[in-house]
């Protein structure tokens, strides 16, 4: 970080986006496990994730498409997970929403996560966040909120 510290933004509403990723580099294609891989971390200065900055976002509950199911890759930061969410995201944006709120992939009634973040609710004085059951990325948002609430 010291070498590239000039790239770390310090203006209000900015941050350093960190994206690690891993991809297979085997010499042949096929239906087999990966034997060699490349691990890369991209660091990029960014502004607000949403066009409206730090203002609340308008979200829509997705009742048709499924982002992830238990036993799949939903709990991993996996590039393929984004493909499953594109259609619903495009519909949401076309209708004036910033994000999709995803429901479970089986019954379509239990809240799982937002398209770009975990979700944490305060309902009747109780803090509620979806359980990590294999289809939700265990992200820094919910972990940070839960730690803050525990410390209070």
Model-predicted regions and their roles:
Residues 21, 28-152:
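Helix-start/capping segments and mature chain N-termini
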Residues 1-3, 9-11:
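N-terminal leader/propeptide and maturation segments of large enzyme subunits in energy/redox metabolism
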Residues 15-17:
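C-terminal catalytic domains of large/alpha subunits in multi-subunit enzymes
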Residues 7-8, 31:
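Short boundary motifs at domain starts and secondary-structure transition points
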Residues 5-6, 21-25:
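Active-site loop/lid in soluble adenylation, ligation, and acyl-transfer enzymes
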């Amino acid at each position: 970080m010291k070498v590239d510290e000039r790239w770390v933004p310090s203006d209000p509403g900015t941050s350093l986006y960190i994206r690690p990723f891993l991809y297979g580099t085997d010499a042949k294609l096929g239906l087999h496990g990966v034997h060699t891989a490349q691990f890369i971390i991209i660091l990029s200065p960014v502004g607000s994730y949403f066009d409206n900055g730090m203002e609340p976002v308008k979200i829509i509950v997705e009742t048709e498409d499924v982002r992830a199911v238990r036993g799949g890759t939903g709990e991993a930061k996996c590039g393929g997970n984004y493909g499953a969410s594109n259609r619903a995201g495009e519909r949401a944006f076309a209708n004036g929403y910033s994000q999709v709120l995803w429901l479970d992939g089986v019954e379509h009634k239990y809240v799982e996560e937002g398209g770009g973040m975990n979700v944490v609710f305060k309902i009747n004085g109780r803090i509620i966040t979806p359980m990590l059951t294999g289809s939700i990325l265990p992200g820094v948002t919910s972990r940070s909120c839960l730690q803050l609430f525990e410390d209070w």
